[in-house]
Amino acid sequence: MPGIRTQMTGPARAAARAGVLLMLAAACSNGGHDEDASAPDSVSADTTAAEPVVLEEAFLTERDTLDNVDSPTVWNGPNGEHWILTSAKTTDVVLVNDAATGAEIRRLGGTGSGRGQLDRPNGVRAIDDLLFVVERDNARIQAFSLPSLESMGTFGEEELLRPYGIAAYEDAEGRIEIYVTDNYELVEDEIPPDSALGERVEQFRVWVEDGELRDEHVRSFGDTTGEGVLRKVETIGVDPANDRVVVAEELGPDSHWKIYRLDGTFSGEVFGRGYFPQEAEGLALYTCPDGGGYWIATDQGMGENTFHVFDRRTLEHLGAFAGVTTRNTDGVALTQAGFGPFPAGAFYAIHNDGNVAAFSWAEIAAALGLRTDCTEGAAPADSAQ
């Protein structure tokens, strides 16, 4: 059942959504993309930097391209559980694997629209004792309890049209703030005109009260003019300490990252231009208590598949790495918890639709001169898809 609403009733919100769709459709007649964009604040790119360091994967999970996997997230439980949870778009499940060995533990879901069922799951995010799964073709988000993996309910049905990526953090009151990208189309396989792109991101607030999932829709956002316009979206990340919501603009040939504020306003900042000639995809954040850390962002490709590292605060490009085997990466995830073979944490990346590759953070850090001192006692860092 859907989560308990705290604002409009379902019918009222559905009617409001229908009105928005009419306005979006009307916008199609008002012209195409706005090319008169003002110059944003941008971190300059020296794309002549050295080739990425190539690192051997610690392991790859068992491969099955029929699953068509997309995005991983990591959960470190209170009783020694360390799981990778990965969406499988074709088989409509979430794969649960041991994060230390890659061994499969179970599969969650199955095709359908009922409680506990999934339809083209895409972005996933584990936070505290909840797993959130974005379902593109059910146009909703479903929450599952951890470690039981029982469905807690769904939300977003009145707001979402074609959702993909998810990012989340816990606020000061213990509620979970969730940002979801919505790559809706008004005509199949066509990007709407800029004037119709004002709802590319939906924000929700979620909490559990008396054993029930409760949610409220906070806002829809996305600029419709200028540099902040989001034309093709999937991956999203959030850094509340720096008031940043980071969204990939996947539309080539100028794929890069745009920075919005937590309140949904465009900051004027973009970064990564020149580093993503193929497509900006999976994103993860490594955080340190002193405010330092790194964004790890993927340039997805079959021939060259590169993970770029940017300074968390300045957004300066610090280096890049690639896997010996890993190619065509959609989502990624990072954990700063030390366990098993990964005393400084681990980085996980999708490999060409079929399985998940694991990398030691200690090895990544050694190769690129990065920090490893933000591990002990750290919660899993935000992952985004």
Where are these regions (language model features)?
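Sequence/structural signature of beta-propeller domains
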Residues: 29-385
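Intrinsically disordered, low-complexity Ser/Thr- and Pro-rich stretches
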Residues: 1-4, 42
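C-terminal motif of bacterial Sec signal peptides marking the signal peptidase cleavage site
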Residues: 24-27
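Bacterial N-terminal signal peptides that target proteins for export
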Residues: 3-18
